[in-house]
Amino acid sequence: MEDVPEEEFPTPSASPSSIRGVPSTRKAASIRTLGRSSADGSSSASRRTLSTSSPALPGTPKEGGKSPRVAGTLQRVRSSPRLPHDTEVEAAPSTMLYWSKAPVFGVIPMRTMRAHTVTLVDTTAWLFGGCDDKECSRDIFCFDTETMQWSRPETMGDLPPPSRAHTATLVDRKIVIYGGGQGSTYYDSVYVLDTITRRWTRPNVTGSKPPPRRAHTGVLYHGKIYMFGGGNGMTALNDVWTLDVSNMSKLRWDELQTIGRKPSHRGYHTANLIGNIMIVVGGSDGKDCFNDIWCLNLDTLRWTKLIVDAPHRRLSHTSTQVGSYLFIVGGHDGTRYRHDLLLFNLVSLAFEPRSTLGKAPSARGYHVTLLADSRLFLFGGFNGSTPFDEVHILDLAAAAYLPQVTHFDIQLPE
């Protein structure tokens, strides 16, 4: 089977809450607690925007002095807030979700934010890889979610090859890259970036390794990264593997034998870790675009399909946990790219309509979203012809979502 056109995947975000699968009805049980949720590469892939009013970039020597960069950290630049301004957009009420375009500056990634990964470490988002319409990148960029500044840190060591549709999983302060590919090449390699030392390593991994793949997903649970699905260039996959990262000097692969009916072979899906449950939304096998939602209990390894009213077909979308909701943004529905926001309630196990104000991002897929300081950041994407290099922000409106349900039980159907 050939992969779906634009064979890149967004990387899911995982933000654990407490969910336990209990065979019963499809409605949820008790809500117990309310509270606040808690490389080196070509320089052609970036551009530098400078102005006399912008602060110096991290690592740029001060005039007559040494570099302000502190070893092992990203130097934060103090600057006045840079606020978006658009006379055509009305101010949003405090209880509404509000889209705006981030006023970014610095060394900006150009045309490669498509099938890339973005991993949040403290307040810094680390971007790796991605592609334009010609080639893939192996560059690293950093985005400060407080100052909106892009920078390009120097990295060293055993650099990974240019890649798209890989996974990037945060383990302590290290980013573990697995799989991906470029052109007709699919990878089965593991690389680790230490965000403190900025050194890449390619560790030895014991055990039988999974087949090369891209467009898969990975979530971290109890010291293991659970990989699901993807494609190998000939067929879509529905296998589950674990990469044991509990000891970073002794990584190990294992294939899992799951229980019950499995999801069909797929890629372009998303996977979120909610407590001990991995929730898989949508995806494609190269022919069909799926609208189903599956749950894998990572303690019992049992698959369960959720019965959802008015499901939505999606591939190359993103899914981010915000309290007791999954925020599903964009993607492709099998016919066209979408720009809408879907909210899936993890308590009622149902989609809820929700409107937004401001200027929403245009229709796209293969973007990345992540949650930082009660804001949902959207990075890049692709609409079938144009890769985007912009950053959008969805303000989640504290009055509407905080405090919110952060500890809850889910009752899965048998």
Regions of interest found by a model, annotated:
Residues M1-E414:
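Kelch-like beta-propeller repeat domains
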